[in-house]
UniProtKB/Swiss-Prot annotation:
GO molecular function: oxidoreductase activity
The entry's keywords: NADP, Oxidoreductase
Pathway(s) where this gene product acts: Organosulfur degradation
Catalytic activity field: 2-hydroxyethane-1-sulfonate + NADP(+) = sulfoacetaldehyde + NADPH + H(+)
Known role: Catalyzes the formation of isethionate from 2-sulfoacetaldehyde in the deaminative pathway of taurine. The enzyme is specific for NADPH; NADH is not a substrate. Responsible for most of the activity observed in taurine-grown cells.
EC number, UniProt record: 1.1.1.313
Annotated residues for binding of NADP(+): 6-30
Native species: Chromohalobacter salexigens (strain ATCC BAA-138 / DSM 3043 / CIP 106854 / NCIMB 13768 / 1H11)
Protein name: Sulfoacetaldehyde reductase
Leading EC class: oxidoreductase
Subunit relationships: Homodimer and heterotetramer.
UniProt-listed PANTHER family: ALCOHOL DEHYDROGENASE
Alphabetized SUPFAM superfamilies for the sequence: NAD(P)-binding Rossmann-fold domains (SSF51735)
Regulation: induction: By taurine.
Amino acid sequence: MTDCVFITGATSGFGRAAAHRFAAAGWSLVLTGRRLERLEALKEELQGRVPVHIIALDVRDSDVVDAAVAALPEGFTRVRTLLNNAGLALAPQSAQHTDRSDWHTMIDTNVTGLVNVTHALLPTLIDVGEGATIVNVGSIAGQWPYPGSHVYGASKAFVKQFSYNLRCDLLGTGVRVTDLAPGIAETEFTLVRTGGDQAASDALYRGTTALTAEDIAEQMFYIATLPPHVNFNRLEVMPTRQAWSAFAIDYDA
């Protein structure tokens, strides 16, 4: 039986790259996202190589998620790997200058959405057992604070701790859980964070070498295909040209 991967946020960035990486290895694909036209285009690219099932899905709606999982067609029901990739960052300015609605949007997607999809697929993953894998896409922002990270960083800290706690609950089932925490990566993610400001997005990467979506997709595939007795609890990935910075200190003028 062909291995099957369920990818959220598959229409761009890490998710899209992961779809191509897993397809290259012959996996069946369940691809989800909110933009149906992009899902259809991606299916068109891949379906000649592997079986592809697409779902226009808002992960924030638990009823919709449950119904989508319950309705998976034959050939896509035994999900071996879940890539919880859907997520976003908004409002990179200081917390006191943000709109509360942006905070709720990040929480609803990065936390509630991830929980919804995980809960819906846990019975399937447990049934698959040994070698089944959940890859939760976190961020270095979930471990290391920086200005403008506020709710985004906190949501990714949740992803990290949820992954650890889930590992404890799933002990003995054979299901593995990894918090995959990327650093700076040049994807559409940054354009969303800057509110569509292409110049601001480009400026973040100018003069350096960021991670690519394909770099992270390769790590996703590596985690999913490790020997069944091996689990990465957390994998933090930065480009070579990124590191931590000094503490911020408020000095008198």
